[in-house]
Amino acid sequence: MKYYKSLVSALLLFTCISSAQTEESGDYIEFNDRRNVVHGVYLGLGTYFGEIDGKSTYHANFKIAYVANRQVEVGFAAVGFYSQQNIPQSTFDNLDFAGAYGGLHVEPILFGKSLLNLSFPIMVGAGAVVYVEDNNRDIDIDPDRDEWEEVFVVEPGLNLLFNLSRYVQLEAGMRYRFSSKIDLAPNRVKNINGFSAGFGIKVGIFNMGRNRYKKHLGDE
């Protein structure tokens, strides 16, 4: 009988010790999980050079996005562009082409914990395009004119990201823009499809929620 009582007592003691170790282990795991959940937000500006209908085109880019665990960005992007089409209209005037579009920005990121990252941005959105008068480089954009047309855009790309600091990230990359058909007099530009390449800067906080306590619980 004493043997069974001793065995039961030993089992109860072992169960209590195991339970205590499990709780401690659970706390330890939960503590370390904080280190793996990293968030970020940023504002980004960029400039790109490319072509529309074979003519030089300049782009300015703006982004605001949330970065989830250094693995994917989700936010809003906007692009304005000016294309030197030089379409002759009269002795002194030529027509160039301009527009703007914006929409959803999603950017999966590879090697997010490294100094250099590789990412695959894609933007899906809409905007408007217009022909503008170029009178010896005196650009005249008339917002009241009727010759505006809506355009829908899908723009995938490839970026190389350099983490300069916790607050600044540089990017360089290229992208290809697919657009809906444009039917706008004088019907020179049929769409705004084309490659562009350039660079940009992002300013924000890229690792909010990072665990700053490097010691294990057992070290304290």
Map each language-model feature to its residues:
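Short glycine/proline- and aromatic-enriched beta-strand/turn motifs that initiate or cap beta-hairpins
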Residues: A20-N69, K202-E220
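Outer-envelope beta-barrel architecture signal
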Residues: R35-V41, R70-V72, S114-F120, R166-L170, ...
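Residues that define the transmembrane beta-barrel architecture of outer-membrane proteins
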Residues: H39-V41, S56-A60, D96-G102, L116, ...
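Membrane-embedded beta-strand positions of outer-membrane beta-barrel proteins
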Residues: L43-L45, I64, F76, V106, ...
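Transmembrane beta-strands of outer-membrane beta-barrel pores
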Residues: T47-E51, A78-Q84, V124-V130, Y176-S180, ...
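Outer-membrane beta-barrel translocator domains and adjoining extracellular loop/strand segments
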Residues: K55-T57, N86-T91, V130-I139, I182-V189, ...
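Gram-negative (and chloroplast) outer-membrane scaffold detector with strong preference
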Residues: Q71-D140, E150-F152, L164
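Predominantly the C-terminal beta-signal and adjacent terminal strand-loop region
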Residues: N163-E220
